[in-house]
Amino acid sequence: MKRILAAFMLLVCMTGCAAQPQGYTADFFAMDTFMSITAYGENEQAAQDTAVQLEQRINALEPALSRTREDSDLYRLNHADGAVCEVSEDTYAAIEAAVQYAEWTGGAFDPTMAPLTDLWGINTDNAHIPAQAEIDAALAHVGYQNIELLGDNQVRLLNGAQLDLGGIGKGFATDAAAALLDGSASVLATLGGNIGAYGENPNRDSGNWVVGIADP
């Protein structure tokens, strides 16, 4: 009886001492918002390496997606006056994805809304409601059909169109970062209002990630 009890206690001890995934959270500011990446690995260093790798990937994407940075592809493209511009692979992929979303939604999503964004002063200290005549004038330059994807990372904007990828930027960055994962890591990424959950949730027996939506 004592041997059985001892074996049982040993089994309980071994179960309790089983290695649990270790987590590491990287908090940082990018793309004009706060972001957080929590990664889990076999030890804290592995988790930290994963989180830092994803953070670096996201930071590297900012020049590809920003339209306000003068050193960015979008800034050059928006100020090219209809000339063909060569952009990075990341920028081209983001524009290509934006065009696909525009086509899928029949234009309900449109990445050429930059003239209207500027007109309304969104994300500035001069936000206001413009006159209808101003809106109509800006709309004359809006339309995803004004984007020409010419291949080999070559892009041209027609009819005075300008790109604003803010509508998909953080989601695109989430997917691009997730593409680096090899399937062994578990990651919860919060990029502004965009959330990506990958692998198994080590904090739940089911391994599932639970998402709640307030006031859907």
State where each predicted segment sits.
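Mature catalytic core of soluble alpha/beta enzymes
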Residues: 4-216
